[in-house]
C-alpha cells in the first residue's frame, strides 16, 4: 500500500502537464474514476471471494491493474499538450 500512496502526488500533477487548458476536467475525471473504483472494489472482492473461496485472487487482480497502469504511464507524454 505504501507504493500505491507514493503515486498519488505525481499522478495528480500529470493533468497539469498534459492538459493545462483542461486541468480541472482531467482532474475531475481522475477523481470520479477513483471514487467509482472505491465503491465497486469491495463488492467485487466479496463476490470473487464468495465464488472462489480464494482470498489471494482479488489481490492478484489488483496487482494486474497496477501493472497495467504502470505500463500505460510510459506512453504519457507531458512534453506534448493535448
Curated annotation (Swiss-Prot):
It comes from the Bacteria. It is found in: Cell membrane. It is a multi-pass membrane protein. Its main location: membrane. GO terms for cellular component: plasma membrane. The keyword Zinc does not apply. The chain crosses the membrane at residues 29-49, 55-75. Coiled coil: none annotated. Keywords: Cell membrane, Membrane, Transmembrane, Transmembrane helix. GO terms for molecular function: transmembrane transporter activity. Signal peptide: none annotated. Pfam families: MFS_1. Disulfide bonds: none annotated. InterPro entries: MFS (IPR011701), MFS_dom (IPR020846), MFS_trans_sf (IPR036259). This is Putative uncharacterized protein YjhE. It comes from Escherichia coli (strain K12). The lineage of its organism: Bacteria, Pseudomonadati, Pseudomonadota, Gammaproteobacteria, Enterobacterales.
Amino acid at each position: 500500500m505504501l507504493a500505491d500512496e507514493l503515486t498519488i502526488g505525481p499522478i495528480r500533477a500529470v493533468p497539469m502537464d498534459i492538459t493545462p487548458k483542461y486541468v480541472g476536467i482531467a482532474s475531475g475525471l481522475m477523481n470520479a474514476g477513483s471514487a467509482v473504483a472505491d465503491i465497486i472494489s469491495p463488492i467485487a472482492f466479496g463476490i470473487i471471494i464468495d465464488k472462489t473461496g480464494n482470498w489471494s485472487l482479488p489481490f492478484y487482480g489488483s496487482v494486474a491493474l497496477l501493472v497495467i497502469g504502470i505500463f500505460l504511464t510510459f506512453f504519457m507524454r507531458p512534453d506534448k499538450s493535448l
